[in-house]
């Protein structure tokens, strides 16, 4: 069987990378940007770091900021209308996963108007045309949406999130500039960083994993494990490490899939508006314990990448426990809650479990699971 791997056409990394945007726009002969960013980034003058580059180069743009932390169908619909009214021919997405996911959905619908209803794109729908060009500038070190082929939209009416997977949605250019992430508060840095670690660990053990994706995921775990505490403390080294680590994780998981940590996190975002990274971080150690019997020796590699010493001489039980505890300790060190008691209502568990089982990430889980298994996992976290 052939293994497919899809990455950005071009990516820029390092402090000051946003200054490369003007040259990319000129080279691609693009004329007007539809800048997709959330209101908080505008209020804190983060988005303006990029628009200043455009203004200095004399490049036209129009702003769109009708974006929520878990973007909705309405956000996408409004974005499609605003893009058509703007006269733009490309998108600059500035932000975390919410801005990126909104931009991807808008870009795909503009290029494929037969999918005017974004719900028609759920799953791995084959679209006829690539998205309008997207230049993605992440401001969080976690989602890696700038290098992935998927996006997640919330259906408010049905209290659910749905995943759309489409090679046509990947940004043509990713600009990963740690200076764009420096204003992230500690809590957001911790949550998005643990999201990145979840991508790397789930991607490493997912059913579709293979040698090339393994290489990216193990390196990502190593970089994130040594960088996240520093990033939360706002050190330059920590910020730079997380900017790279989350991108490397995205290079991997986008091409092989994830598992039930993400399946269980998605309904929490849809029902309670729980930040995605926080949900992943709380769930990850418990699901790692559940999945351990289906992972062979991979937890030995995870433990070593997390910085655990002496893994080569450990028994299977020891290195599996060490991997889980290293993840749990990192989450505690960066201030992640230990459980879901303040988030989940017990009476909602049947709905959450069914939603998680139906989620597009669930089939990638290395261990066969059921609605009942997932309900038990939620219950164990209360």
Over which residues does each language-model region extend?
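Short glycine/serine/threonine-rich phosphate/pyrophosphate-binding segments
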Residues: 18-21, 43-46, 73-76, 99-103, ...
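Carboxylate- and glycine-rich phosphate/diphosphate-binding segment that chelates Mg2+/Mn2+
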Residues: 150-256
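Catalytic phosphate/nucleotide-handling subdomain of diverse soluble enzymes
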Residues: 267-306
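N-terminal small/polar loop signature for handling phosphorylated ligands or for N-terminal nucleophile
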Residues: 42-115, 229-239
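Glycine/threonine-rich beta-strand-loop-alpha-helix active-site module
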Residues: 74-179
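C-terminal charged capping/lid subdomain of soluble metabolic enzymes
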Residues: 299, 309-382
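An N-terminal, well-structured beta->alpha segment
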Residues: 1-64
